[in-house]
């Protein structure tokens, strides 16, 4: 029996990825491999700040190496669309320390 990562159900869905260096990248999961390298389409990075609203930097088609992924989660599109990111303030995430 082949091992599964649980990502199969997220293909073609909008996901949020927190990387080990503290970045938050959102996009449509297009594919992945056995090393959990992932391909995102229509992606953007959300940059958080305590002084100004969330900045969103367009990345487009983007590949993230599996060894740089901290967390992958499905995004609730309705809830996400209801947020006013221009008014949202938060401390940036710190890198993961092993």
From Swiss-Prot:
Its main location: nucleus. One of its GO terms (molecular function) is RNA binding. GO terms for biological process: mRNA splicing, via spliceosome. The keyword Acyltransferase does not apply. It is found in: Nucleus. Component of the nuclear LSM2-LSM8 complex which is involved splicing nuclear mRNAs. LSM2-LSM8 binds directly to the U6 small nuclear RNAs (snRNAs). LSM8 is essential for the formation of the nuclear LSM2-LSM8 complex involved in the accurate splicing of selected development-related mRNAs through the stabilization of the spliceosomal U6 snRNA. Plays a critical role in the regulation of development-related gene expression. Residues 2-78 form the Sm domain. SMART domains: Sm (SM00651). Keywords: mRNA processing, mRNA splicing, Nucleus, Ribonucleoprotein, RNA-binding, Spliceosome. This is Sm-like protein LSM8. SUPFAM superfamilies: Sm-like ribonucleoproteins. It holds the Pfam family LSM. Component of the heptameric LSM2-LSM8 complex that forms a seven-membered ring structure with a donut shape. The LSM subunits are arranged in the order LSM8, LSM2, LSM3, LSM6, LSM5, LSM7 and LSM4. LSM8 subunit interacts only with its two neighboring subunits, LSM2 and LSM4. Interacts with the prefoldin co-chaperone subunits PFD1, PFD2, PFD3, PFD4, PFD5 and PFD6. Belongs to the snRNP Sm proteins family. Disruption phenotype: Developmental alterations, such as reduced root length, alterations in the shape and number of cotyledons, small rosette leaves with short petioles, early flowering, short siliques with reduced seed number and frequently aborted seeds. Lower pre-mRNA splicing events and reduced levels of U6 snRNA, but elevated levels of U4 snRNA. InterPro entries: Lsm8 (IPR034103), LSM_dom_sf (IPR010920), PTHR15588 (IPR044642), Sm (IPR047575), Sm_dom_euk/arc (IPR001163).
